[in-house]
Amino acid sequence: MMKRDECLKVLARHRTDEIVVAVYKAAQDWIHIAPSDLNYTFTGAMGQGSSHALGLALGRPDKRVVVLDGDGSLLMNLGSLVTIANAAPKNFMHCVCENGTYETNGAVPIPTHGSFTFTGMAREAGYVNTYTFDNLDDWDRNLDTLLKEDGPILVDLKVEPGEDYPENFPRLYSTEHRDRFRKALAES
């Protein structure tokens, strides 16, 4: 099992010019770990991270799009898996931070957690490849290859909460952040 923030720090070290879509707890962590105008971060639309990332991947096929989803969030929109697989964006990397809870909603346990796999669901939906990591060294060693692999791919990251970064809702929802993202997207 990996600490979520440590897992995201590994991604930040390997990141070049990818668009990163992060939701909920991963978004709160990500804006502190890897600030960038190419971060698309939000909360308040549980389950929609993968759909937003799909739109960006289709709109910018020249740029790699990495979505940092939560397991509870993905469960709120499982239909996105077949939609993503059908669209088949080669530039799409779907990371699921799996901790077995709806963490944002008070760490409510996910019913029947452990009796299904996100990699299995993604494979059945039609994702090109799926991977599972529960060890930081393995994640670090494989990440450069994953960031270049044709997608859509799903990466299940077995995590537990790490450092508790302060919530920064004004940053997530500011018009300044939105405008900087649009400008960075247009200029990249």
Language model regions located:
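Extracellular glycan-recognition modules
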Residues: R15-D17
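Feature captures the catalytic ectodomains and active-site-proximal regions of enzymes
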Residues: M1
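Short, polar loop motifs at secondary-structure junctions
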Residues: Y24-A27
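Thiamine diphosphate
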Residues: R4-K9, I19, I31-E187
